[in-house]
Amino acid sequence: MLLADLSSATYTTSSPRLLSKYSAAADLVLRVFDLTMVVASGLIAYRIVFGTWVPAAPYRVAIATTLLYSVICFALFPLYRSWRGRGLLSELVVLGGAFGGVFALFAVHALIVQVGEQVSRGWVGLWFVGGLVSLVAARTLLRGFLNHLRTQGVDVQRVVVVGLRHPVMKISHYLSRNPWVGMNMVGYFRTPYDLAVAEQRQGLPCLGDPDELIEYLKNNQVEQVWISLPLGERDHIKQLLQRLDRYPINVKLVPDLFDFGLLNQSAEQIGSVPVINLRQGGVDRDNYFVVAKALQDKILAVIALMGLWPLMLAIAVGVKMSSPGPVFFRQRRHGLGGREFYMFKFRSMRVHDDHGTTIQQATKNDTRITRFGSFLRRSSLDELPQIFNVLGGSMSIVGPRPHAAQHNTHYEKLINHYMQRHYVKPGITGWAQVNGFRGETPELRTMKKRIQYDLDYIRRWSLWLDIRIIVLTAVRVLGQKTAY
């Protein structure tokens, strides 16, 4: 938030010049505005339900009680922190959690003092929905206004960097493409560990040596200093911090971790100790990921089952008529966390022994495949029973395709970061499949490329990416000739 950002010194050590004479007032205005929205939405809901703006005594008590709970919850949640550089969705999730907490406290209060006998539940429900919509709309408009101001050069923080390494160049490129973040990287102070000039690619000016940093800060307006040095240069970093003790300003460490095989890296604080998460899946990364992905999977799986059950029944009859054996083929696969589960398919091959250790993918003109099974595999209809895996929770609609258990044993020794694909649930379709990496992988480089797409999906996951993959599956994958 703009108002919280202007008063960032409330939460972090910062330069006195950041403390605009309006910042404290602006923060107070935002807090009062949020509380006013809570009360106003209650009055509007009362007007809609009862046709008057003047609430009866029990409703006035309910509004006053909820206002008190709002003060408590809005203070406990990080609503008024600096959201600079963070997405709007993250802010709205916190807002929703805070407002949900308000009404959770009100619900407990109502049960204890039996408010439900005096207050309409319809009014409470309308109040909650209206209040949440109003707060979300207000924050969205405020964020849009803030972004517009920053693209015009207003409320932009100036940053200098000690050291010029790959992470800094990546951030510099990001900031140049996203002016709404409101940060301007002014230049860097050179160190022996910097990138070669040929690698820099961008014209960040050199401001001198680290010895000149303090003098530069005295003569120029700078809001943040970033330190980008190798992790092994602990003494050098400590020396820089000691110099900066003489000049209070925000200081950030930009560690160079790009060679560590990162996956969804983030930072957090446990107790009073800062911790960097180097590798984590969606489950550990974000509660939003867990809830949104689970809801999406269950809803789409139920819809698919309701719409496709006649086709699945017809396929089951066709499988039974094509060759002796069961309708479904069940095979051990590795899923979330590398745990084994049984994946279901319509059987497309003649019954054979699948318990050996030899890795044998289906190949072109494979004699094990029945004629009807060949049609199922080309059209990907053999994958439909995996809807039951999704409903059971062992798979997702979209995710890295689960490989046979023997493949994991084989490829984890040959491909770096191969097992990182198990940070999420496997999917019926995936990012690699819609990009042409489906079916047989006769060469190691083909499998490596598939794994790259799997990890890229985990890093980039969003609901929109899942929808895109589902659409592309229908357009590109169904009938693809690489499936035998």
From Swiss-Prot:
Matching Pfam families: Bac_transf (PF02397), CoA_binding_3 (PF13727)
Reaction(s) catalysed (UniProt annotation): di-trans,octa-cis-undecaprenyl phosphate + UDP-alpha-D-glucose = alpha-D-glucosyl di-trans,octa-cis-undecaprenyl diphosphate + UMP
InterPro entries, alphabetized: Bact_transf, EPS_sugar_tfrase, Undecaprenyl-P_gluc_Ptfrase
Taxonomy, superkingdom: Bacteria
Enzyme class: transferase
Topology term for the membrane: Multi-pass membrane protein
GO MF annotation, one: undecaprenyl-phosphate glucose phosphotransferase activity
Transmembrane segments: 37-57, 59-79, 93-113, 122-142, 299-319
Gene disruption phenotype: Cells lacking this gene fail to synthesize any xanthan biosynthetic lipid sugar intermediates. They do not produce xanthan and exhibit a 50% virulence index reduction.
EC number: 2.7.8.31
Cell compartments where the protein resides: Cell inner membrane
GO cellular component: a single term: plasma membrane
Pathway: Glycan biosynthesis; xanthan biosynthesis
Keywords: Cell inner membrane, Cell membrane, Exopolysaccharide synthesis, Membrane, Transferase, Transmembrane, Transmembrane helix
NCBIfam families: EPS_sugtrans (TIGR03025), WcaJ_sugtrans (TIGR03023)
Record remark on domains: The C-terminal domain is sufficient for glucosyl-1-phosphate transferase activity.
Stated family: Belongs to the bacterial sugar transferase family.
Function in brief: Is the initiating enzyme for the synthesis of the exopolysaccharide xanthan. Catalyzes the transfer of the glucose-1-phosphate moiety from UDP-Glc onto the carrier lipid undecaprenyl phosphate (C55-P), forming a phosphoanhydride bond yielding to glucosyl-pyrophosphoryl-undecaprenol (Glc-PP-C55).
Protein name from the UniProt record: UDP-glucose:undecaprenyl-phosphate glucose-1-phosphate transferase
Species of provenance: Xanthomonas campestris pv. campestris
